Amino acid sequence: MPKKPAAKGPFFFFMLEFRRREESRGKSFPGGMDQVMREAGPHWNQLNEAEREVYKDRAKSYKELPKQNYGEKYTAQGIAFSQVEMEKQQLLKKHETIRKTISEMIQTAVLNNALEKLEVFFMSCNYFCKTSTEAFVPAEIALIKYNLELGVLDKLHELINPVRLPLGLAHEALTYSEQTHELPTPPNAMGETDFYTVLQKILSFTDYNSKPHKKLAIMTDAKEVPVIESLLSQLNDDVKLEYQFLVIPLGEFFFHLKRATEKYGLDICTFPTKTVADILLKKDAYEYTSGIACDFHEKLGNQRFCALSKVVRWSYIISDNCCLDLSIDLIAGRHLPSNADTTLCSDLYETTSKTNQSQSDGMSFVSSSELTHFTLPKIQKVQSKSAFRSVEDKNGSVIYSSRTVPKKDVKTETTEPHAPINPFYMVDGNDSVYAPSYPTKSNGTRPGTSYNPFSRQKKLDEVREPHGLDVKGKGRGTLLVTANNSFSSMLKGAGRGSGLFAGLSSVGSNSSVRLSDDEN
């Protein structure tokens, strides 16, 4: 059975009022009521008896309520259902705000025909440890300004020195640092100690004052969203100001941006769900790229966990997937690593109209949009020589088809797929052999056959000669033989039955012998 909730005294109602007052000022309590209790305690101790009397009256009125089922209910963990529902609604509202913000950004850029000029900010943060109140102690931040047309426009990198760590977390911070970013922990940490200076650099870099009526949208990896939110909240609390930021998962923005760019160059959807964008970001094809990290991590050889390297790699992934749709020339060092070969990308832009090879109009015949390497590239595939690829298109590419019949080589086909090898065929009165009938050509051979020097069929046909005698039988016990010496010698090498007739030399050439198994 769950533990019965504690009685609600005056301090409980003071905590509720304290929480509402602080949240109206923009402060959040990720630690829940435990965090509210710790922060409200010092304020409660400063109240005199007259000020506490208000909350005592509220507690007394609550106890006098009828003890029926319409009172406050709690979960098995002792959390009020009203609080759970409130947090759920806040999360849904936040997701709706993120979706609406992304949609407005992209739609506005599309309507102004300036999608490639849309500027966004990518941010990453390394931390030393995580406290019991879900707060992260920052160690390093990195921020870049990016658009599709020019790639990485500007960079901001800053190491942060928190001076001291929360009590009891020094070992945890040291272990986490050694496993990831390898930055020295306090008291040996490097970087800026004044949070106000860090905040001012962020505001100046993002030109926050030019858009005071809106929340500043910052993109980051989905796993880093709580870290960035904690950092920005700490910066606001330290300077006692309320700057509005909206932290957006990068995969969500990447998905909607790709869907928008596809409409310019493709007639199909290659990003059906957000999962595709998340997989590409998680794959991180440029993870070990050198020359894009900060000086400290470059010297250390740990570019992978550098915050600056992360945000630059994210920009490379988005450029690699979206710029070609808009026929944007990729710039090495901004869209892709500085040592990347962009000549192939340049060749892919030189497209040809599918309707007229000589006079390209530069427009897709399906969507009336500019052609890209996805619609009709000039670089064609080398045709395969495989026997199983027999359906070819005009561009030289090969299409696999399960209905395609492989071409046969006549020389390798067997000579007698249906040829009988039993020499005991019966002969009728018209000297015709009862054998399966096959369609023959004018030269007497069956279609699809060729001469095989190792076949016994010719010799067996000679054994069955001649056909002008009145010899009948059931075939299995009947064999026509003559006294012809050449035929006897031929019969000896014919296989079965040769031993029965090797000594029959007295039979004339005009006579015949009938041997039958059913003879009485």
Curated annotation (Swiss-Prot):
<dbReference type="GO" id="GO:0007283">
    <property type="term" value="P:spermatogenesis"/>
</dbReference>
<keyword id="KW-0943">RNA-mediated gene silencing</keyword>
<keyword id="KW-0469">Meiosis</keyword>
<dbReference type="GO" id="GO:0060964">
    <property type="term" value="P:regulation of miRNA-mediated gene silencing"/>
</dbReference>
<keyword id="KW-0539">Nucleus</keyword>
<dbReference type="GO" id="GO:0045892">
    <property type="term" value="P:negative regulation of DNA-templated transcription"/>
</dbReference>
<keyword id="KW-0217">Developmental protein</keyword>
<keyword id="KW-0221">Differentiation</keyword>
<dbReference type="Pfam" id="PF09011">
    <property type="entry name" value="HMG_box_2"/>
</dbReference>
<dbReference type="GO" id="GO:0030154">
    <property type="term" value="P:cell differentiation"/>
</dbReference>
<dbReference type="GO" id="GO:0005634">
    <property type="term" value="C:nucleus"/>
</dbReference>
<dbReference type="GO" id="GO:0034587">
    <property type="term" value="P:piRNA processing"/>
</dbReference>
<dbReference type="InterPro" id="IPR036910">
    <property type="entry name" value="HMG_box_dom_sf"/>
</dbReference>
<feature type="DNA-binding region" description="HMG box">
    <location>
        <begin position="4"/>
        <end position="75"/>
    </location>
</feature>
<dbReference type="Pfam" id="PF13017">
    <property type="entry name" value="Maelstrom"/>
</dbReference>
<keyword id="KW-0963">Cytoplasm</keyword>
<dbReference type="GO" id="GO:0007140">
    <property type="term" value="P:male meiotic nuclear division"/>
</dbReference>
<feature type="region of interest" description="Disordered">
    <location>
        <begin position="436"/>
        <end position="455"/>
    </location>
</feature>
<keyword id="KW-0238">DNA-binding</keyword>
<protein>
    <recommendedName>
        <fullName>Protein maelstrom homolog</fullName>
    </recommendedName>
</protein>
<feature type="compositionally biased region" description="Polar residues">
    <location>
        <begin position="439"/>
        <end position="455"/>
    </location>
</feature>
<dbReference type="InterPro" id="IPR039259">
    <property type="entry name" value="Protein_maelstrom"/>
</dbReference>
<comment type="similarity">
    <text>Belongs to the maelstrom family.</text>
</comment>
<dbReference type="InterPro" id="IPR009071">
    <property type="entry name" value="HMG_box_dom"/>
</dbReference>
<dbReference type="GO" id="GO:0043565">
    <property type="term" value="F:sequence-specific DNA binding"/>
</dbReference>
<dbReference type="GO" id="GO:0043186">
    <property type="term" value="C:P granule"/>
</dbReference>
<comment type="function">
    <text>Plays a central role during gametogenesis by repressing transposable elements and preventing their mobilization, which is essential for the germline integrity. Probably acts via the piRNA metabolic process, which mediates the repression of transposable elements during meiosis by forming complexes composed of piRNAs and Piwi proteins and governs the repression of transposons.</text>
</comment>
<dbReference type="InterPro" id="IPR024970">
    <property type="entry name" value="Maelstrom"/>
</dbReference>
